[in-house]
């Protein structure tokens, strides 16, 4: 969220699930006065990430494009958001991905003209399946940001991340 705010990305919508009330309290305290909205996936325990994405998309105000960043990837650099933004074509619906060592990573910047299709997509593989249907719209930009690799799924990963970045 810090990197997004430093780039001027606003508003930011956060979809909450497990321990959502605790996380909401922390975010409200830390980001008081920012354009941060929180919505809930109350069925998080029985649904997938695509469901949370659809809930978030249903809550965002009209926009030209939006970044999609899972909450367990907290250290994506400001420069990555800016590079992906600059790579986005102006007049063509596109999905711009940062790449690291040739792999597509988060956060993609997605043209808002894809929102209705995402909201109605029920195919296999979640959004990966959706991307495959829209390969012709994908734009990539190489970045040098280990934050694009940093995925915190365990407490051990979280601890290493805190040690590295807050040191």
What residues fall within each predicted segment?
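Conserved alpha/beta core of the MobA/IspD/sugar-nucleotide pyrophosphorylase nucleotidyltransferase superfamily
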Residues: 116, 120-167
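Hydrophobic packing residues within well-ordered alpha-helices of enzyme cores
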Residues: 23-27, 84, 118, 161
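Active-site phosphate/pyrophosphate- and oxyanion-stabilizing loops and adjacent acidic/basic residues
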Residues: 25, 54, 82, 128-129
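Conserved N-terminal catalytic core of the sugar/cofactor nucleotidyltransferase
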Residues: 1-64
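Conserved beta-loop-beta/alpha segment of the NTase-like Rossmann-fold superfamily
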Residues: 37-38, 45-116
């Amino acid at each position: 969220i810090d990197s997004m705010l430093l780039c001027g990305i606003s508003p930011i919508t956060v979809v909450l699930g497990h321990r959502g009330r605790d996380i909401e309290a922390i975010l409200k305290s830390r980001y008081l006065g920012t354009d941060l909205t929180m919505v809930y996936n109350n069925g998080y325990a029985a649904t997938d990430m695509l469901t949370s994405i659809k809930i978030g998309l249903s809550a965002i105000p009209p926009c030209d494009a939006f970044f999609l960043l899972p909450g367990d990837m907290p250290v994506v650099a400001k420069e990555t958001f800016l590079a992906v933004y600059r790579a986005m074509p102006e007049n063509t619906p596109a999905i711009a991905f940062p790449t690291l060592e040739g792999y597509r990573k988060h956060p993609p910047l997605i043209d808002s003209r894809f929102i209705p299709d995402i909201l109605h997509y029920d195919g296999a593989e979640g959004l990966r399946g959706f991307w495959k249907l829209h390969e012709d719209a994908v734009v990539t930009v190489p970045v040098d940001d280990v934050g694009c690799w940093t995925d915190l799924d365990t407490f051990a990963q979280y601890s290493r991340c805190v040690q590295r970045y807050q040191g």
